[in-house]
């Protein structure tokens, strides 16, 4: 199936996108030597609600990644409709590019990955790539217990990303600056949107 295309899928709520997401994108492109990184904002997440509507989050992503070589922002999950399960997105882009894509998640996802819809299929149909978010030992131990062999999972060697969208929304709500937390292209708009 693999045609030589090295494709990464980076999904998330991006509510809002922050500098940590941008760092993950840059390091992922470099470390995995990707031909293309597809950033996919979730449309209808199965386990949590988003604050900002899809259109707003999609618009912010487009602004931030505009001009960044090899990055594409996709509205696939909106077009597909229904609940946004990652396996459907993986299968879709796998078929489009005729390759087994890399699927990028934060290391906190390892603590509940077995609860993801068709998680075994995700592991079979993509190469799981994990970026650091905290000191990851407990997550790795849990994943080892539940998933078994982790040798097929790629753990990115990059700085730990500790910024969270939840923290950003809270900062905006109480009127604190988001300088350094979100890209400058969208900072003022994000401050106003989530502000009290």
Curated annotation (Swiss-Prot):
GO molecular function, one term: nicotinate-nucleotide adenylyltransferase activity
Protein's pathway: Cofactor biosynthesis; NAD(+) biosynthesis; deamido-NAD(+) from nicotinate D-ribonucleotide: step 1/1
EC number: 2.7.7.18
Keywords: ATP-binding, NAD, Nucleotide-binding, Nucleotidyltransferase, Pyridine nucleotide biosynthesis, Transferase
GO biological process per UniProt: NAD biosynthetic process
Biological role stated in the UniProt entry: Catalyzes the reversible adenylation of nicotinate mononucleotide (NaMN) to nicotinic acid adenine dinucleotide (NaAD).
GN (gene name): nadD
InterPro entries the UniProt entry points to: Cyt_trans-like (IPR004821), NadD/NMNAT (IPR005248), Rossmann-like_a/b/a_fold (IPR014729)
Catalytic activity field: nicotinate beta-D-ribonucleotide + ATP + H(+) = deamido-NAD(+) + diphosphate
Pfam families in UniProt: CTP_transf_like (PF01467)
Protein name as catalogued: Probable nicotinate-nucleotide adenylyltransferase
Organism annotation: Thermotoga petrophila (strain ATCC BAA-488 / DSM 13995 / JCM 10881 / RKU-1)
Membership in a protein family: Belongs to the NadD family.
